[in-house]
Amino acid sequence: VYIHHMLVPSEPQPNDAIEDLRTFVAGRRFGAILADPPWQFQNRTGKVAPEHRRLARYSTLALSQIKELPVAHAAAPVCHLYLWVPNALLPDGLEVMKSWGFHYKSNIIWHKIRKDGGSDGRGVGFYFRNVTEILLFGVRGKHARTLAPGRTQVNYMSSRKREHSRKPDEQYQLIESCSKGPFLELFARGNRAKWGSWGNQADQYIPDWPTYSNHSQNETPLFSKVLQ
């Protein structure tokens, strides 16, 4: 069954998100969970500050709100977690993983490249110009090793950056080959066959603001809206 669910696209309320996720899961358990939370950045004064102008167009959640999400209720006894985290928030990502009941094991690095294959230097960063993002990998339960393809899968992906915050589609094939299903994506930006999708952009991801030339608005849609 393909699962689709949408939060009301407004400023997120932690209690609403918690109950919404509980309702969505409804007793189901997933063998692999992919999450791309709307992390909240702070500037050097400690005030909430977008890392980039485009971030102002997205609602974000505080670290405490992300940690409170009942992800453990969606996890099978043996489960893999793939958790996206910006470089600057790596400690927060590890903290979230622990709060959700998973043990950190490894990571996969996404290298954002230009059309010519060079590093895409349009990223941001106070100390260095970021051209990578981190996909943390954690497990829960016994005998939670990756499937056979994972033994030869390198922990690296490279692809062109598209609209803001969108992650590479290569992630899905990697996860499907290395982890057992059923599969669940949290804070999803599209529907995919064999995956449950939860998030306020889960039906589609078409930006209505100027963005990179190779964004998905210029592509044939990858996902169709499928209701349970």
Where are these regions (language model features)?
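Class I S-adenosyl-L-methionine-dependent methyltransferase catalytic core
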Residues: 1-228
